[in-house]
Design a protein with these regions (language model features):
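Short beta-strand-to-loop elements that line the ligand-binding cleft
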Residues: 1-4
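Detector for C-terminal structural segments
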Residues: 8-119
Length: 119
């Protein structure tokens, strides 16, 4: 059953199967906090895991990037074991830039910050 966007978003957390693209969050922990913590409104998978919540508390409180990566490794292993989601696709991102364009770097959110470029 395919619904128009306006109707889909009224039901997306209660459907048996839904496809959601989680994008445009500066930190990986943000998506996990929004989508998989017990009881949060956008937890469409209804994932409920005390160890996950505890690890996320630790990750959120860890400012050192290298240390946070170690905690998030445990989070990802737990999610792979528990299976709250299925990763159906990996989005390919391609960018073409002329060599005359200086200062261009692909941003992780796929936004283009044109004020940083020059020709």
């Amino acid at each position: 059953n395919v619904l128009p966007s306006a109707q889909y978003w009224d039901h997306w957390t209660i459907e048996t199967f839904a496809y959601t693209a989680w994008t445009h969050r500066p930190l990986g922990v943000m998506v996990l906090d929004l989508a998989y913590r017990t009881g949060v409104p956008w937890n469409e998978s209804h994932f409920d895991n005390a160890k996950f919540n505890s690890l996320m508390d630790t990750a959120d409180a860890t400012l050192d990037v290298a240390k946070r990566k170690l905690v998030l490794k445990q989070v990802e292993e737990l999610m792979q074991e528990e299976g709250p989601i299925v990763q159906p696709v990996w989005r390919a991102v391609f960018t073409g830039v002329n060599k005359r364009v200086k200062g261009f770097k692909m941003h992780p959110t796929n936004y283009f910050f044109c004020e940083e470029w020059s020709v």
